[in-house]
Structures are given as C-alpha cells and as structure tokens.
Design a protein with these regions (language model features):
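Compositionally biased terminal segments of proteins
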Residues: 1-166
Length: 166
C-alpha cells in the first residue's frame, strides 16, 4: 500500500474495522503519506479533539487494548497520562491522544472503513506546532511536501497559530 511501511500495510485492513477508532482521526506523517504518497510511514497516530468546553478528554485505553488484541498480540502498552496511550501490536506502534484543543481539521478525509484522515492543512498546522517542541528531519520533510502541493506558507502558518491558540 502506497505510503505505508510493509508491516503496517499488512494490518491496515483489520485496523480499519475497529470500532474504537471511530471518534479518532489518523494524524501525523502516516496520514500525510497516505494522501501525498511522499514517504513510507509506519506508526499509526490517532487523535481526537475537544468538541465542547465541558468534555472530559480521556483515552479509553482498556477498550482500545481489547480491540487491538484482535489484530495481534499486544507487545507493549505505555500509559503516559489519561489523554495519551501507546501500544505496539504486530510490530506497529499505535498512539492515541485526546487533545484538549478544538480540531484543526477542516475537511475530513475518509480513507478506509473507520479510518478517517486529518486533511493536509490540519496536519501541516500540527506539524508546525510540534516542531516548536522537537526537531525531527521527517517533520521538516513533511512541511516541505505540504508546501509542494501549492498550499501557501502564510495560510499554513495562520492555521498553525489558530490551532496553537496564538
């Protein structure tokens, strides 16, 4: 499958059938690679955002773990906080985030089954924000790839500023 590392491609059909991902969007490099076909990506980063001020932002890791175990053995589980958990299943890293911010997604992209992708502009905004905290070559490459699609850098920066509440 274009955009996915081979071991991720092997399980993507099963992942697409999981009920636990319905409220999440696939974000990050993998979501971008599936849309732009710029590089192979292997991690599956799922994120959901606040929809109301009073919403409690938590990841139901026990429900997710139970469903992920239908794909393969849970090789690892790391609970970082009530809003962030990671698993390794069949050699693939899964991340689940419940973000306290409102969604930057303007156009939902249905990929397959229950997998929906954040749109390119939203991914760019999130990449720009994360680059303030870390410096990975792949993030710079992803921003370059986004700009190559014709998205205006000023529009992308404005979207990133709105997302980061600046």
């Amino acid at each position: 499958m274009i955009g996915l590392a081979p071991h991720t491609g092997k399980i993507i059909d099963a992942v697409a059938q999981l009920d636990c991902i319905r409220s999440y969007w696939l974000v990050g490099g993998t979501a971008l690679s599936l849309q732009l076909h710029t590089r192979q990506s292997e991690d599956l980063d799922f994120q959901k955002w606040r929809t109301s001020k009073d919403e409690k932002m938590e990841v139901a890791w026990d429900v997710i773990e139970k469903e992920l175990s239908t794909i393969g053995e849970i090789e690892r589980r790391d609970i970082y906080d009530f809003d962030h958990v990671e698993f390794r299943v069949a050699g693939v890293k899964f991340s689940f985030y419940a973000c306290d911010k409102y969604s930057p997604v303007q156009n939902e992209v249905i990929y397959q089954g229950n997998i929906k992708l954040a749109d390119v502009m939203a991914i760019g905004a999130m990449k720009m924000e994360v680059m303030l905290r870390r410096s990975n070559f792949r993030d710079y490459y992803d921003i370059y790839s986004i700009l190559q699609t014709g998205i205006d850098i000023h529009e992308l920066m404005n979207h990133a500023l709105q997302y980061s509440r600046h």
